[in-house]
Amino acid sequence: MAERRLVAVLGQVQTYVFQLEMLKRCDPAVVRELAPRVKLNALMCRYLARRLPLEAQTTPLTCALRLALAYARAEGDRVLGALAAAGDDAEAYFERTMGGACRFHARVALDTYGGRVETELQFLHDAENLLKQLNYCHLITPHAVDLSAVDEFLARTIGGGLVVPPELYDPAQPCAVCFEELCVTANQGEATHRRLLGCVCDHLTRQLAVRVDPEDVAKNLPHVHGLDEARRGRALAALAAVDAAEAREAEAASTAAAGAEAGDAGETARRRADALLDAHDVFRPASRRLYAVSELQFWLASTNQAVRALDLFTHNLDDLERRERRAEVRAAAVELALFGRRPEHFDRARAARELDIIDGLLVGGCAASPDERLEALIRACYDHHMSTPMLRMLDPDRANRDALERLLEGGDDADADGGAAGGADAGDGGVGDEDGPGAPPPADAVAWADLPAAALRDAERRRRLYADRLSRRSAASLAQCVREQRRELEKTLRVNVYGDALLHTYVAVAAGFRARRAFCEAAARAGTVVDERETGCFDAHSFMKATVQRHPVDAALLPAVTRKFFELVNGPLFAHDTHAFAQPPNTALYFAVENVGLLPHLKEELARFMVARDWCVSEFRGFYRFQTAGVTATQRQAWRYIRELVLAVAVFRSVFHCGDVEVLRADRFAGRDGLYLTYEASCPLVAVFGAGPGGIGPGTTAVLASDVFGLLHTTLQLRGAPSR
């Protein structure tokens, strides 16, 4: 029930955020009328932020609500402040609500044990890449890492409503979900990283189908509340007058087109052909010439049908522009009838003088959906391709019309030879076919006087065949280009909303660091706390280290300790080994290292890291102490420390047989006894004994240590070696 209420609250907050984004782009005179409602919603956002304990919870739902409330509070104050400062000056209002430096650029600095790392966030994929890198380097990053810059960036982006600004995402950059999808799908022998080059990410942002109805104003105007009935009637009458004027213009254009078509030579030839064919019936023999005219009519009809189907499939850019102008005229008529003036919204104040045709395609309009703009753009590409001289020369419709005119000018139908053979000899091809009506006669039947004309016809025919071959190749290349670029064009031109991939990534990484901090705080409040970080005995360290080093690691234990090493090295983001259908820890680590682009030699080193002879690397009370600089060197040193811990515990269990001593992660604490690795340089190891289902309580003993072998000696004392 609580989750349902949070979902309902999140929906209301996102609705308010969307309204704020609309008001930031509206005429300030319109915003002034709605200012009291904005103030009430701003107060409600403050009340919710104080009432709901969102900071203490790390779920995607609570995180999304917290980010949305933070954005709503900031932008609500911004709108009200801009309205008070700018008055009715639209330019000043827009400058205060949307002006200034780009809010999608953020500098992030992270402190690790290997030094400070600085980067810049510009896109959503930059934030996701940073979180994946932080997940890989979590073992050299303290739990007190400052993620406030990332949190503010996400509040300005994910918290800023549903619609994603086009400048905020790069669809050519794959995310972790893209990589995982490609890993489980058929690859046809192609490497995953090569397939990623052609990937269009649809996870950080998702495409949304948008339906645009040009008649929305006419449908909704009679049902709008708060309008004076006289003004409503004038607005409806203005719409009717605009529709009548458009109908008259369309009828005049249709009449002019029909007149132009009637005067066309091709249409005249077609009417003559229709009259010639209508005069024939089945009781009269069909001559060769009549059959050729009928065949050309067939090809012309099929070609025109294909063109009409293509015209129904898409529109031209000019058609979209006319539709936008029509919608603008209708909106102007309604606004003048209702309000007596046209509000100076942001798109009207800036779009006319600052946006070109490409910007218009990206931004969109009120009369055409993104899919219609995409289809118009593709149609424009095909029209431009078909307008080349070579392809216009090969236009089959034009060639068939020319052949039809030549046949009709050849003479009367009665002087042709017999009919029955005409159909068999005419063939079933078009004009471009070798045996069709336009094919030249055989060479031996040509008179000597006609040799020059026959040679010219033969050369023209060869030139047409060569051009036809080139045109087929160019058309195939264009079709392939459209297929390859269509997905990216769809992603760019369609409306995109925020997906849940980035939010889940941020919550998983932040929850890992928060769980580590909560474990360390709980261990410090245990019923019995033994702090050996500064009081550890050197004799105990030396005894346990010498004992462990005298015994080699059993080769049969190598697979188990390798899996444990991979489990401890992996970050909190990729938890495939904890799913209901758990995979081995090396699978989760594979996704972690591949998503950060780890170099091949480091991946090979990590895979063979457990095969080592000298694995004892820490000094007395010197476990997880880093003296090196640089992320890679510090990461390698952390691997050595974790390898030492895993192998020392494995040998300890096989030598002393004092129960099942497990090495566990602090960010996955589930009330189990064992040795916990906290990844904190100040307190890297915590041994927990007597933990219950509720976690660490008054009856729990927690041993805080910074020495592996001293902690193993304390574990031996607390558990006691069995008598033999």
From Swiss-Prot:
HAMAP family: HSV_TRM1 (MF_04014). This is Tripartite terminase subunit 1. It comes from Suid herpesvirus 1 (strain Indiana-Funkhauser / Becker). Belongs to the herpesviridae TRM1 protein family. ATP binds at F652, R653, S654, V655, F656, H657, C658, G659. Keywords: ATP-binding, Host nucleus, Late protein, Metal-binding, Nucleotide-binding, Viral genome packaging, Viral release from host cell, Zinc, Zinc-finger. The lineage of its organism: Viruses, Duplodnaviria, Heunggongvirae, Peploviricota, Herviviricetes. It holds the Pfam family PRTP. One of its GO terms (biological process) is viral DNA genome packaging. Its main location: host cell. A zinc finger (C3H1-type) spans 175-203. Associates with TRM2 and TRM3 to form the tripartite terminase complex. Interacts with portal protein.
